[in-house]
Regions:
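PLP-dependent amino-acid enzyme catalytic core
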Residues: 1-124
Length: 124
């Protein structure tokens, strides 16, 4: 998959976007297209956090072989968080669930993304 700047038509690969960070024109890199295949969402509900992360990321980081991506997500999320599930989700009602973010170091979602980012940079 190619990535393009939000301020120009500059296009680069995912590894280049990871390493470069911002585009030369100061824009952000976004996917050239959104990979929105038909997904049976019920098939995702029983995946672990690592499995779900790999499932989503392989659609956006097509330059990374699937086996490598699984190894990267496994390394990033194994032994890093206090909960076995990484982010436990507690069902409050049939229509409402809450992610228990207090199991991550700063109690914020950024811990999830930033745990994987260094592994992606090393791979790139």
């Amino acid at each position: 998959m190619r990535y393009r700047s939000t301020r120009s038509e500059e296009k680069i690969s995912a590894p280049q976007a990871l390493l470069q960070g911002l585009a030369k024109d100061g824009g952000l890199y976004v996917p050239e297209m959104l990979p929105v295949p038909f997904i049976e969402y019920n098939s995702l509900k029983d995946l672990s956090y690592k499995e779900l992360a790999s499932f989503v990321l392989k659609r956006f980081l097509t330059d990374i072989p699937e086996n490598d991506l699984k190894k990267l997500t496994d390394a990033a999320y194994t032994g890093t968080f206090d909960a076995k599930e990484i982010v436990p989700v507690k069902r409050m009602t049939d229509a409402f669930s809450v992610a228990e973010m207090f199991y991550v170091r700063t109690w914020a979602f950024k811990d999830l993304a930033l745990s994987l980012f260094p592994y992606l940079l090393v791979w790139a």
